[in-house]
Amino acid sequence: MGVLKTALEWMLRFFYDLSGSYGIAIILLTLAIRLILAPLTLSQSKSMEAMKALQPEMQALQARYKDKPEEYQRKVMELYQEHKVNPLGGCLPMLVQLPFLWALFAVLREFDFGTGFLWLTSLSAPDPLYILPILSAVTTYIQMMMTSADASQKSMMFIMPVFIGYISINFPAGLVIYWVVSNLF
């Protein structure tokens, strides 16, 4: 993580030199990270669409093999192979983004910004007005609504945004800006 942290810190300073604002630098850094991860995000979208298209067939298999779970699992795996679908394909971009998130968290927690951004007095401290945590919850909810392939995840679509909003209360404002901008793109 040290190399990634150093690279993100360098990029943050580079974008600050371009913009003159660490808030804008974080937004530009977020867009750069999203651009770097775009091929994985596209792959995730395709995988989710393929899984969504297979839902009717999977439900039919579930009804047909409801008393034979082993046979059901075998048939589902055959269905995945037949349609060249990887059920874990949607997870990869999220897993790849985690090191970026952790490294950025470390950078923003230790970074001395010297100035604030908009209403924020420090990008290293939590948002005292809770505007960013609310935005993080709202944008997480919108993103989940746009990308969810499974109706059975409805409870998660409400729990996850509330959880993200809650934990964002204590995160550095710069990290929450990253999360919000990342959700929007």
Predicted regions span which residues?
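Helix-loop-helix
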Residues: M1-F185
